[in-house]
Amino acid sequence: MLKKAYIEITNRCNLHCTFCPGTRREKQFMTVEAFSSLLPKLRPWTDYLYVYLHVMGEPLSHPQLAELLSLAAARERKVCITTNGTLLARQTETLLAAPTLHKVSVSLHSFEGNDGAQEREREYLDAVWAFADRAATRGVIVALRLWNEGGAETRNGAIEAFLHEKCPGEWPEPRGGS
């Protein structure tokens, strides 16, 4: 049985990250009709499913995001979204109004991957944190992600300092892995 399915609701992105392979496909948004017809096709594979609205593209840029979230709720699907975080302030109310929203993962390294100016970095991080704080009070999981190596990681120290400011105290050592 499946536990999750990835649905690419758009392959359009508002950024051009240096670490993203991108796509040569025509840029488009999935229609509400296509999304609506896809959800019941997943039913035979599971009784409970997390729907991840991300493959390529920035899901928060979808002009009908609220409708897609409503359709997922009607089909009792929990929604997980991965975002670059730049549109969170604009979509906060839509996201937090969705009872089906389970998790939002924010790729904090996206800002640096777009030659993000250091003077705008604090504004970006503050907006992400404001969303994360509100979402957490509603029981939504928020994961703040950073590249460890091989990507846009030169600003990780500054981002970690920001996070330590927001979450003071001892932090466990990062997990290693292969």
Where are these regions (language model features)?
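Conserved alpha-helical substructure of the radical SAM core
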Residues: M1-K103, N114-R122
